Protein backbone atom coordinates (compact mmCIF):
# COMPACT_ATOMS: atom_id res chain seq x y z
CA UNK A 1 0.00 0.00 0.00
CA UNK A 2 1.22 3.45 -0.84
CA UNK A 3 1.05 6.64 1.22
CA UNK A 4 -1.46 8.96 -0.44
CA UNK A 5 0.18 11.95 1.25
CA UNK A 6 3.49 11.11 -0.44
CA UNK A 7 1.67 10.81 -3.77
CA UNK A 8 -0.02 14.18 -3.30
CA UNK A 9 3.25 15.82 -2.28
CA UNK A 10 5.19 14.54 -5.29
CA UNK A 11 2.98 12.99 -7.99
CA UNK A 12 5.65 13.41 -10.67
CA UNK A 13 8.18 11.32 -8.75
CA UNK A 14 5.55 8.66 -8.01
CA UNK A 15 4.54 8.34 -11.66
CA UNK A 16 8.18 8.30 -12.79
CA UNK A 17 8.83 5.22 -10.63
CA UNK A 18 5.44 3.64 -11.34
CA UNK A 19 5.75 3.86 -15.12
CA UNK A 20 9.08 2.00 -14.97
CA UNK A 21 6.93 -1.10 -14.50
CA UNK A 22 5.47 -0.49 -17.95
CA UNK A 23 2.26 0.96 -16.52
CA UNK A 24 0.46 4.22 -17.31
CA UNK A 25 0.68 7.22 -14.93
CA UNK A 26 -1.84 6.98 -12.12
CA UNK A 27 -1.08 9.72 -9.58
CA UNK A 28 -3.71 12.15 -10.91
CA UNK A 29 -6.54 9.63 -10.60
CA UNK A 30 -5.47 8.75 -7.06
CA UNK A 31 -5.31 12.41 -6.07
CA UNK A 32 -8.84 12.92 -7.46
CA UNK A 33 -10.11 10.03 -5.34
CA UNK A 34 -8.40 11.56 -2.32
CA UNK A 35 -9.92 14.95 -3.10
CA UNK A 36 -13.38 13.36 -3.23
CA UNK A 37 -12.67 11.75 0.13
CA UNK A 38 -11.50 15.06 1.63
CA UNK A 39 -14.60 16.89 0.38
CA UNK A 40 -16.84 14.17 1.84
CA UNK A 41 -15.02 14.32 5.19
CA UNK A 42 -15.30 18.12 5.28
CA UNK A 43 -19.03 18.04 4.52
CA UNK A 44 -19.63 15.45 7.24
CA UNK A 45 -17.53 17.31 9.79
CA UNK A 46 -19.22 20.62 9.00
CA UNK A 47 -22.65 19.04 9.39
CA UNK A 48 -21.66 17.50 12.72
CA UNK A 49 -20.18 20.78 13.92
CA UNK A 50 -23.31 22.68 12.91
CA UNK A 51 -25.51 20.10 14.65
CA UNK A 52 -23.50 20.47 17.85
CA UNK A 53 -23.60 24.26 17.64
CA UNK A 54 -27.34 24.32 16.90
CA UNK A 55 -28.04 22.00 19.83
CA UNK A 56 -26.18 24.40 22.10
CA UNK A 57 -28.06 27.37 20.65
CA UNK A 58 -31.38 25.63 21.36
CA UNK A 59 -30.56 25.62 25.05
CA UNK A 60 -29.59 29.26 24.95
CA UNK A 61 -32.78 30.21 23.07
CA UNK A 62 -34.96 28.36 25.57
CA UNK A 63 -33.11 30.00 28.43
CA UNK A 64 -33.85 33.38 26.84
CA UNK A 65 -37.49 32.28 26.32
CA UNK A 66 -37.07 32.79 22.56
CA UNK A 67 -39.37 29.95 21.58
CA UNK A 68 -39.52 30.93 17.91
CA UNK A 69 -35.76 30.79 17.63
CA UNK A 70 -35.68 27.47 19.49
CA UNK A 71 -38.21 25.95 17.08
CA UNK A 72 -36.18 27.04 14.04
CA UNK A 73 -33.05 25.54 15.56
CA UNK A 74 -34.79 22.28 16.47
CA UNK A 75 -36.02 21.97 12.89
CA UNK A 76 -32.47 22.54 11.67
CA UNK A 77 -31.11 19.85 14.02
CA UNK A 78 -33.81 17.43 12.89
CA UNK A 79 -32.92 18.04 9.25
CA UNK A 80 -29.20 17.58 9.97
CA UNK A 81 -29.98 14.35 11.80
CA UNK A 82 -31.74 13.14 8.66
CA UNK A 83 -28.99 14.13 6.22
CA UNK A 84 -25.94 13.12 8.27
CA UNK A 85 -26.19 9.35 7.64
CA UNK A 86 -25.91 10.01 3.91
CA UNK A 87 -22.88 12.24 4.49
CA UNK A 88 -21.26 9.58 6.68
CA UNK A 89 -21.99 6.95 4.03
CA UNK A 90 -20.35 9.18 1.43
CA UNK A 91 -17.21 9.35 3.60
CA UNK A 92 -17.20 5.56 3.96
CA UNK A 93 -17.66 5.07 0.21
CA UNK A 94 -14.90 7.56 -0.64
CA UNK A 95 -12.56 5.95 1.89
CA UNK A 96 -13.25 2.52 0.43
CA UNK A 97 -12.77 3.72 -3.16
CA UNK A 98 -9.36 5.18 -2.34
CA UNK A 99 -8.29 2.15 -0.30
CA UNK A 100 -9.36 -0.21 -3.09
CA UNK A 101 -7.47 1.79 -5.70
CA UNK A 102 -4.33 1.94 -3.57
CA UNK A 103 -4.54 -1.77 -2.70
CA UNK A 104 -4.40 -2.77 -6.38
CA UNK A 105 -1.33 -0.69 -7.23
CA UNK A 106 2.02 -2.52 -7.16
CA UNK A 107 5.07 -1.44 -5.22
CA UNK A 108 7.56 0.96 -6.81
CA UNK A 109 10.88 -0.48 -8.04
CA UNK A 110 14.09 0.77 -6.48
CA UNK A 111 16.27 2.96 -8.69
CA UNK A 112 18.85 0.21 -9.30
CA UNK A 113 16.31 -2.31 -10.62
CA UNK A 114 16.95 -2.90 -14.35
CA UNK A 115 14.16 -1.85 -16.71
CA UNK A 116 12.53 -4.46 -18.90
CA UNK A 117 9.18 -5.75 -20.09
CA UNK A 118 9.45 -9.40 -19.02
CA UNK A 119 11.90 -12.14 -17.99
CA UNK A 120 14.08 -11.36 -21.00
CA UNK A 121 15.03 -8.11 -19.27
CA UNK A 122 16.40 -9.85 -16.17
CA UNK A 123 20.12 -9.46 -15.52
CA UNK A 124 22.48 -12.17 -14.29
CA UNK A 125 24.25 -11.05 -11.14
CA UNK A 126 26.52 -14.05 -10.58
CA UNK A 127 26.54 -17.84 -10.70
CA UNK A 128 27.89 -20.75 -8.68
CA UNK A 129 29.53 -23.91 -9.96
CA UNK A 130 29.20 -25.37 -13.42
CA UNK A 131 26.82 -27.63 -15.29
CA UNK A 132 27.51 -31.29 -14.62
CA UNK A 133 28.67 -33.42 -17.52
CA UNK A 134 27.31 -36.91 -18.13
CA UNK A 135 28.36 -39.91 -20.21
CA UNK A 136 24.67 -40.51 -20.91
CA UNK A 137 21.65 -38.39 -21.78
CA UNK A 138 20.11 -37.07 -18.54
CA UNK A 139 16.45 -37.84 -17.98
CA UNK A 140 13.70 -35.67 -16.53
CA UNK A 141 12.83 -36.12 -12.85
CA UNK A 142 9.36 -37.49 -13.59
CA UNK A 143 10.74 -40.17 -15.92
CA UNK A 144 13.27 -41.15 -13.26
CA UNK A 145 10.77 -41.04 -10.41
CA UNK A 146 8.16 -43.12 -12.21
CA UNK A 147 10.77 -45.68 -13.28
CA UNK A 148 11.83 -46.00 -9.64
CA UNK A 149 8.19 -46.56 -8.66
CA UNK A 150 8.43 -43.67 -6.20
CA UNK A 151 6.65 -40.85 -8.04
CA UNK A 152 3.00 -41.49 -8.88
CA UNK A 153 1.02 -38.88 -10.80
CA UNK A 154 -1.85 -41.22 -11.71
CA UNK A 155 -2.61 -42.02 -8.08
CA UNK A 156 -2.49 -38.32 -7.24
CA UNK A 157 -4.86 -37.52 -10.12
CA UNK A 158 -7.40 -40.02 -8.77
CA UNK A 159 -7.23 -38.30 -5.40
CA UNK A 160 -6.98 -34.65 -6.38
CA UNK A 161 -6.79 -34.10 -10.14
CA UNK A 162 -3.95 -32.60 -12.17
CA UNK A 163 -0.84 -30.89 -10.71
CA UNK A 164 -0.46 -33.19 -7.71
CA UNK A 165 1.96 -36.03 -6.99
CA UNK A 166 2.31 -38.94 -4.59
CA UNK A 167 5.91 -39.53 -3.48
CA UNK A 168 6.90 -42.86 -1.96
CA UNK A 169 9.78 -44.62 -0.27
CA UNK A 170 13.20 -43.14 -1.00
CA UNK A 171 11.96 -40.04 -2.81
CA UNK A 172 9.49 -39.22 -0.03
CA UNK A 173 12.32 -39.51 2.46
CA UNK A 174 14.65 -37.47 0.24
CA UNK A 175 12.16 -34.61 0.06
CA UNK A 176 11.76 -34.67 3.85
CA UNK A 177 15.55 -34.72 4.25
CA UNK A 178 15.95 -31.66 2.02
CA UNK A 179 13.42 -29.66 4.04
CA UNK A 180 15.00 -30.66 7.35
CA UNK A 181 18.47 -29.80 6.05
CA UNK A 182 17.34 -26.35 4.93
CA UNK A 183 15.70 -25.65 8.29
CA UNK A 184 18.71 -26.86 10.27
CA UNK A 185 21.07 -24.54 8.38
CA UNK A 186 18.80 -21.50 8.58
CA UNK A 187 18.02 -21.94 12.29
CA UNK A 188 21.37 -23.29 13.46
CA UNK A 189 23.70 -21.07 11.43
CA UNK A 190 21.77 -18.18 9.89
CA UNK A 191 19.94 -16.96 12.97
CA UNK A 192 16.35 -17.57 11.87
CA UNK A 193 13.72 -18.57 14.42
CA UNK A 194 11.68 -21.60 13.38
CA UNK A 195 7.92 -21.11 13.41
CA UNK A 196 5.14 -23.64 12.84
CA UNK A 197 2.34 -21.34 11.65
CA UNK A 198 -1.31 -21.93 10.68
CA UNK A 199 -1.90 -23.00 7.09
CA UNK A 200 -5.36 -21.40 7.08
CA UNK A 201 -5.51 -17.61 7.29
CA UNK A 202 -8.21 -14.94 7.14
CA UNK A 203 -8.78 -12.16 4.62
CA UNK A 204 -6.81 -9.60 6.62
CA UNK A 205 -3.68 -11.74 6.54
CA UNK A 206 -3.89 -12.24 2.77
CA UNK A 207 -4.51 -8.52 2.32
CA UNK A 208 -1.54 -7.67 4.52
CA UNK A 209 0.98 -9.42 2.29
CA UNK A 210 -0.86 -8.30 -0.88
CA UNK A 211 -2.25 -11.60 -2.16
CA UNK A 212 -5.68 -10.00 -1.85
CA UNK A 213 -7.51 -8.44 -3.51
CA UNK A 214 -5.60 -8.47 -6.80
CA UNK A 215 -4.59 -12.15 -6.90
CA UNK A 216 -7.77 -13.71 -5.55
CA UNK A 217 -8.07 -16.12 -8.49
CA UNK A 218 -4.63 -17.59 -7.78
CA UNK A 219 -5.59 -18.63 -4.24
CA UNK A 220 -7.44 -21.58 -2.74
CA UNK A 221 -10.44 -20.42 -0.70
CA UNK A 222 -11.20 -22.82 2.14
CA UNK A 223 -14.62 -21.40 2.95
CA UNK A 224 -16.04 -20.52 6.34
CA UNK A 225 -15.51 -22.43 9.57
CA UNK A 226 -18.81 -22.76 11.37
CA UNK A 227 -22.15 -21.21 10.55
CA UNK A 228 -21.74 -17.63 9.38
CA UNK A 229 -18.03 -17.70 10.06
CA UNK A 230 -15.40 -15.67 8.26
CA UNK A 231 -13.83 -17.21 5.16
CA UNK A 232 -10.38 -18.77 5.25
CA UNK A 233 -7.61 -19.23 2.69
CA UNK A 234 -4.95 -21.90 2.29
CA UNK A 235 -1.59 -20.14 2.38
CA UNK A 236 0.19 -19.82 -0.98
CA UNK A 237 3.43 -19.33 0.96
CA UNK A 238 4.43 -19.16 4.63
CA UNK A 239 5.30 -15.52 3.92
CA UNK A 240 1.64 -14.79 4.66
CA UNK A 241 1.64 -16.37 8.11
CA UNK A 242 5.12 -15.26 9.14
CA UNK A 243 4.89 -11.63 7.99
CA UNK A 244 1.46 -11.14 9.55
CA UNK A 245 2.81 -12.10 12.97
CA UNK A 246 3.73 -8.42 13.33
CA UNK A 247 0.43 -7.07 12.01
CA UNK A 248 -1.11 -4.26 14.08
CA UNK A 249 1.88 -4.07 16.41
CA UNK A 250 4.62 -1.64 17.37
CA UNK A 251 8.01 -3.33 17.76
CA UNK A 252 11.03 -2.16 19.68
CA UNK A 253 13.77 -1.48 17.12
CA UNK A 254 16.26 -3.05 19.51
CA UNK A 255 14.61 -6.38 18.64
CA UNK A 256 15.12 -5.90 14.91
CA UNK A 257 15.89 -7.46 12.56
CA UNK A 258 13.41 -10.21 13.36
CA UNK A 259 14.22 -13.30 11.28
CA UNK A 260 11.65 -16.09 10.93
CA UNK A 261 11.55 -19.34 8.97
CA UNK A 262 8.99 -22.09 8.42
CA UNK A 263 8.71 -25.34 6.49
CA UNK A 264 5.13 -25.65 5.28
CA UNK A 265 2.96 -27.00 2.51
CA UNK A 266 1.90 -24.22 0.13
CA UNK A 267 -1.20 -24.13 -2.04
CA UNK A 268 -1.66 -22.25 -5.31
CA UNK A 269 -4.48 -22.41 -7.83
CA UNK A 270 -2.07 -21.42 -10.64
CA UNK A 271 -4.99 -19.85 -12.50
CA UNK A 272 -2.64 -18.00 -14.83
CA UNK A 273 -0.47 -21.02 -15.60
CA UNK A 274 -2.82 -23.05 -17.79
CA UNK A 275 -0.81 -25.12 -20.25
CA UNK A 276 2.54 -24.30 -18.62
CA UNK A 277 4.74 -26.94 -17.00
CA UNK A 278 2.04 -29.59 -17.15
CA UNK A 279 4.56 -32.44 -16.83
CA UNK A 280 6.21 -33.47 -13.60
CA UNK A 281 6.54 -31.57 -10.33
CA UNK A 282 7.67 -28.15 -11.58
CA UNK A 283 4.32 -26.42 -11.10
CA UNK A 284 2.06 -28.04 -8.51
CA UNK A 285 -1.08 -26.96 -6.69
CA UNK A 286 0.51 -28.23 -3.46
CA UNK A 287 4.22 -28.08 -2.72
CA UNK A 288 6.58 -27.78 0.24
CA UNK A 289 8.76 -24.74 0.81
CA UNK A 290 11.08 -23.30 3.43
CA UNK A 291 10.28 -19.60 3.75
CA UNK A 292 12.53 -16.87 5.11
CA UNK A 293 11.02 -13.62 6.43
CA UNK A 294 12.79 -10.61 7.90
CA UNK A 295 11.30 -7.59 9.65
CA UNK A 296 13.74 -4.71 9.92
CA UNK A 297 14.24 -0.94 9.83
CA UNK A 298 14.43 1.17 6.66
CA UNK A 299 18.15 1.76 7.22
CA UNK A 300 18.95 -1.97 7.33
CA UNK A 301 16.63 -3.43 4.70
CA UNK A 302 19.09 -3.25 1.81
CA UNK A 303 21.78 -5.14 3.75
CA UNK A 304 19.19 -7.60 5.02
CA UNK A 305 18.18 -8.32 1.42
CA UNK A 306 21.75 -9.24 0.51
CA UNK A 307 22.04 -11.37 3.65
CA UNK A 308 18.83 -13.24 2.89
CA UNK A 309 20.05 -14.01 -0.62
CA UNK A 310 23.31 -15.39 0.73
CA UNK A 311 21.40 -17.63 3.16
CA UNK A 312 19.29 -19.08 0.35
CA UNK A 313 22.37 -19.57 -1.80
CA UNK A 314 24.30 -21.34 0.95
CA UNK A 315 21.99 -24.35 1.16
CA UNK A 316 22.19 -24.83 -2.62
CA UNK A 317 25.98 -24.56 -2.54
CA UNK A 318 26.13 -27.30 0.06
CA UNK A 319 23.96 -29.48 -2.13
CA UNK A 320 26.51 -28.96 -4.89
CA UNK A 321 23.95 -27.54 -7.31
CA UNK A 322 24.89 -25.18 -10.12
CA UNK A 323 22.76 -22.03 -10.14
CA UNK A 324 22.68 -18.43 -11.25
CA UNK A 325 21.29 -15.36 -9.48
CA UNK A 326 19.16 -13.00 -11.56
CA UNK A 327 18.12 -9.45 -10.70
CA UNK A 328 14.55 -9.23 -11.91
CA UNK A 329 13.66 -6.33 -14.18
CA UNK A 330 10.80 -3.92 -13.57
CA UNK A 331 8.42 -5.89 -15.80
CA UNK A 332 9.03 -9.26 -14.12
CA UNK A 333 9.20 -8.44 -10.42
CA UNK A 334 6.38 -9.31 -8.05
CA UNK A 335 3.50 -7.06 -7.06
CA UNK A 336 4.74 -6.29 -3.52
CA UNK A 337 8.44 -6.15 -4.32
CA UNK A 338 10.79 -3.18 -4.57
CA UNK A 339 13.61 -5.42 -5.77
CA UNK A 340 13.88 -9.17 -6.30
CA UNK A 341 16.69 -11.64 -6.78
CA UNK A 342 15.74 -14.98 -8.31
CA UNK A 343 17.95 -18.02 -7.85
CA UNK A 344 17.67 -20.31 -10.86
CA UNK A 345 19.04 -23.81 -10.44
CA UNK A 346 20.31 -25.88 -13.35
CA UNK A 347 18.14 -28.91 -14.14
CA UNK A 348 19.76 -31.12 -16.82
CA UNK A 349 16.58 -33.09 -17.53
CA UNK A 350 14.42 -30.11 -18.43
CA UNK A 351 13.68 -29.44 -22.10
CA UNK A 352 16.28 -30.11 -24.75
CA UNK A 353 19.66 -30.13 -23.08
CA UNK A 354 18.56 -28.83 -19.68
CA UNK A 355 17.29 -25.50 -18.37
CA UNK A 356 17.54 -23.07 -15.49
CA UNK A 357 14.44 -23.04 -13.28
CA UNK A 358 13.55 -20.70 -10.45
CA UNK A 359 14.06 -22.23 -7.02
CA UNK A 360 14.04 -19.10 -4.86
CA UNK A 361 12.89 -15.49 -4.98
CA UNK A 362 14.26 -13.06 -2.40
CA UNK A 363 12.42 -9.74 -2.26
CA UNK A 364 12.64 -6.52 -0.30
CA UNK A 365 9.22 -4.87 0.02
CA UNK A 366 10.06 -1.66 1.88
CA UNK A 367 7.06 -0.46 3.91
CA UNK A 368 4.55 -1.62 1.26
CA UNK A 369 3.27 -4.60 3.30
CA UNK A 370 3.78 -2.84 6.63
CA UNK A 371 1.29 -0.11 5.65
CA UNK A 372 -1.28 -2.75 4.74
CA UNK A 373 -0.68 -4.52 8.08
CA UNK A 374 -0.13 -1.40 10.22
CA UNK A 375 3.17 -2.89 11.42
CA UNK A 376 5.48 -0.34 12.97
CA UNK A 377 8.54 0.00 15.16
CA UNK A 378 9.64 2.54 17.73
CA UNK A 379 13.22 3.82 17.74
CA UNK A 380 15.26 5.83 20.24
CA UNK A 381 13.23 8.98 19.52
CA UNK A 382 10.06 7.18 20.59
CA UNK A 383 8.21 7.89 17.35
CA UNK A 384 6.57 4.92 15.61
CA UNK A 385 7.35 4.32 11.92
CA UNK A 386 6.55 1.57 9.47
CA UNK A 387 8.94 -1.39 9.40
CA UNK A 388 10.41 -2.86 6.23
CA UNK A 389 9.57 -6.45 5.31
CA UNK A 390 11.53 -8.98 3.28
CA UNK A 391 10.73 -12.51 2.18
CA UNK A 392 12.49 -15.27 0.31
CA UNK A 393 12.39 -18.97 -0.41
CA UNK A 394 15.07 -20.80 1.46
CA UNK A 395 14.28 -22.71 -0.76
CA UNK A 396 11.38 -24.43 -2.54
CA UNK A 397 11.75 -28.03 -1.34
CA UNK A 398 9.89 -29.64 -4.24
CA UNK A 399 12.05 -27.92 -6.83
CA UNK A 400 15.17 -28.70 -4.80
CA UNK A 401 14.09 -32.35 -4.93
CA UNK A 402 13.77 -32.10 -8.71
CA UNK A 403 17.23 -30.52 -8.94
CA UNK A 404 18.79 -33.24 -6.79
CA UNK A 405 17.09 -36.03 -8.75
CA UNK A 406 18.17 -34.65 -12.12
CA UNK A 407 21.69 -33.58 -11.13
CA UNK A 408 22.52 -36.68 -9.09
CA UNK A 409 20.99 -39.23 -11.45
CA UNK A 410 23.15 -42.16 -12.50
CA UNK A 411 23.18 -44.09 -15.74
CA UNK A 412 21.17 -46.97 -14.29
CA UNK A 413 18.38 -44.58 -13.23
CA UNK A 414 19.30 -44.53 -9.55
CA UNK A 415 19.82 -41.32 -7.57
CA UNK A 416 22.96 -40.71 -5.52
CA UNK A 417 22.21 -38.95 -2.23
CA UNK A 418 24.23 -35.72 -1.75
CA UNK A 419 26.68 -35.97 1.15
CA UNK A 420 25.01 -33.23 3.22
CA UNK A 421 21.74 -35.18 3.19
CA UNK A 422 23.19 -38.52 4.32
CA UNK A 423 22.62 -37.81 8.05
CA UNK A 424 18.89 -37.50 7.31
CA UNK A 425 18.57 -40.64 5.17
CA UNK A 426 19.04 -43.43 7.72
CA UNK A 427 22.05 -44.90 5.95
CA UNK A 428 20.54 -44.77 2.45
CA UNK A 429 23.22 -43.56 0.03
CA UNK A 430 21.61 -44.44 -3.29
CA UNK A 431 17.93 -44.41 -4.17
CA UNK A 432 17.27 -47.29 -6.52
CA UNK A 433 14.36 -49.45 -7.63
CA UNK A 434 13.65 -52.38 -5.34
Curated annotation (Swiss-Prot):
Primary location recorded for the protein, binned into one broad class: cytoplasm
GO molecular function terms noted in the UniProt entry: ATP binding; serine-tRNA ligase activity
Residues reported in the UniProt entry to bind L-serine: 237-239, 291, 393
Gene3D superfamilies: Bira Bifunctional Protein, Domain 2, Serine-tRNA synthetase, tRNA binding domain
EC number: 6.1.1.11
InterPro entries linked: aa-tRNA-synt_IIb, aa-tRNA-synth_II, aa-tRNA-synth_II/BPL/LPL, Ser-tRNA-ligase_type_1, Ser-tRNA-synth_1_N, SerRS_1_N_sf, SerRS_core, tRNA-bd_arm
GO terms for biological process, alphabetical: selenocysteine biosynthetic process; seryl-tRNA aminoacylation
Keyword Cytoplasm applies: yes
Record keywords, A-Z: Aminoacyl-tRNA synthetase, ATP-binding, Cytoplasm, Ligase, Nucleotide-binding, Protein biosynthesis
Pathway membership: Aminoacyl-tRNA biosynthesis; selenocysteinyl-tRNA(Sec) biosynthesis; L-seryl-tRNA(Sec) from L-serine and tRNA(Sec): step 1/1
Subcellular location per the Swiss-Prot or TrEMBL entry: Cytoplasm
GO cellular component terms, semicolon-separated: cytoplasm
The reaction(s) this protein catalyses: tRNA(Ser) + L-serine + ATP = L-seryl-tRNA(Ser) + AMP + diphosphate + H(+); tRNA(Sec) + L-serine + ATP = L-seryl-tRNA(Sec) + AMP + diphosphate + H(+)
Subunit architecture: Homodimer. The tRNA molecule binds across the dimer.
Record text about domains: Consists of two distinct domains, a catalytic core and a N-terminal extension that is involved in tRNA binding.
Family: Belongs to the class-II aminoacyl-tRNA synthetase family. Type-1 seryl-tRNA synthetase subfamily.
Protein's job: Catalyzes the attachment of serine to tRNA(Ser). Is also able to aminoacylate tRNA(Sec) with serine, to form the misacylated tRNA L-seryl-tRNA(Sec), which will be further converted into selenocysteinyl-tRNA(Sec).
Official protein name in the record: Serine--tRNA ligase
Organism: Rhodopseudomonas palustris (strain BisB5)
Organism phylogeny: Bacteria, Pseudomonadati, Pseudomonadota, Alphaproteobacteria, Hyphomicrobiales
